[in-house]
Curated annotation (Swiss-Prot):
It comes from Thermococcus litoralis (strain ATCC 51850 / DSM 5473 / JCM 8560 / NS-C). It is a multi-pass membrane protein. Residues 75-286 form the ABC transmembrane type-1 domain. It holds the Pfam family BPD_transp_1. This is Trehalose/maltose transport system permease protein MalF. It comes from the Archaea. It is found in: Cell membrane. CDD domains: TM_PBP2 (cd06261). Keywords: Cell membrane, Membrane, Sugar transport, Transmembrane, Transmembrane helix, Transport. Part of the ABC transporter complex MalEFGK involved in trehalose/maltose import. Responsible for the translocation of the substrate across the membrane. InterPro entries: MetI-like, MetI-like_sf. PANTHER family: BLR7065 PROTEIN (PTHR43005), INTEGRAL MEMBRANE SUGAR TRANSPORT PROTEIN (PTHR43005:SF2). Its main location: membrane.
């Protein structure tokens, strides 16, 4: 009798659980799974605007993309941008979070100021940086002219354009890392620090033995979110350089956009699916590394 009652209660709880997550599953199905499946289906066809027929070509679009130098170069640009940007944002975000976690006068105002760049829409932020990078009347070249230094074409060479984009992205997104890591720091019990202080632990020892281990789960989540976002970078590059000079800063998303603009939806969709696979691969690596270190 008791076993039967327990089984019924478990069934009701399971049924309630499924009903609770049903709206979320519906959203995931409609806005994630179906669009990805639709994009994959298009990528299996020669879908070009000026060609009425859309013949099924299988994986031919993928072979064409994978054999193209521009795809691998854009992949290199995207991965390099993600690595440099996320690394800098993590270091700066953790530094700001540690400072804002201290009991400072006016830290509420400081937190609000730090979050301002994140609140600015990316298009507006990128346009502002574009004006500051301008060769003729930009802020940076104006400062150089005061110092007696020749102006620099910040967006005119591949290397300078790459780092110009990185700087703009770091300024925009570091507050996001700061916010996540600050929330993780505030969840760490202060008793641990007080006990370590009594034991004579230095600031570095407290950071190494208490802060980093307890902050690691939040740090991994922050890295996953930022890496996913960085690998999909489009808007800030589109506004600042448009992929130039000479395609030197073209990301994978921008490359797919260019093919869509040309009306080649089959190739554009294939690049989009490969971008999805790239993002998924990095996410799995982060999760595996994080789980291994926790174990």
């Amino acid at each position: 009798m008791d076993n039967n009652l327990t089984s019924k209660l478990k069934y009701r709880e399971a049924k309630l659980g499924y009903l609770m997550i049903l709206p979320l599953l519906t959203v995931v199905l409609v806005f994630i799974i179906l669009p990805v499946m639709g994009t994959f289906w298009i990528s299996l066809h020669r879908d070009v605007t000026f060609i009425p027929e859309k013949p099924f070509v299988g994986l031919r679009n993928y072979l064409r993309v994978l054999s193209a130098r521009e795809f691998w170069y854009s992949t290199f640009v995207t991965v390099s941008f993600s690595f440099v940007s996320v690394s800098l944002e993590t270091i700066l975000g953790l530094s700001f979070a540690l400072i804002l976690n201290e009991r400072l006068k006016g830290r509420g105002v400081l937190r609000a100021i730090v979050l301002i760049p994140w609140a600015v829409p990316t298009i507006i932020s990128a346009r502002t940086w574009e004006l500051m990078y301008n060769y003729s009347y930009g802020l940076f070249n104006w400062i150089l002219s005061i110092l007696g230094v020749s102006p620099v074409n910040w967006l005119g060479t591949p290397i300078s354009a790459f780092f110009a984009i990185v700087i703009a992205d770091v300024w925009k997104t570091t507050p996001f890392m700061t916010l996540l890591l600050l929330a993780g720091l505030q969840a760490i019990p202060q008793d641990l620090y007080e006990a370590a202080l009594i034991d004579g632990a230095s600031m570095f020892e407290r950071f190494k033995s208490i802060t980093l281990p307890l902050l690691k789960p939040v740090l991994i989540v922050a890295l996953i979110l930022r890496t996913i976002d960085a690998l999909r970078v489009f808007d800030i590059i589109y506004v600042l350089t448009g992929g130039g000079p000479g395609g030197a800063t073209t990301s994978i998303s921008l490359l797919a956009f260019n093919y869509y603009n040309l009306g080649d939806y089959g190739i554009g969709s294939a690049i989009s699916i490969l971008t999805f696979v790239l993002v998924l691969s990095f996410t799995i690596v982060y999760l595996k590394v994080g789980r291994f270190r926790r174990d």
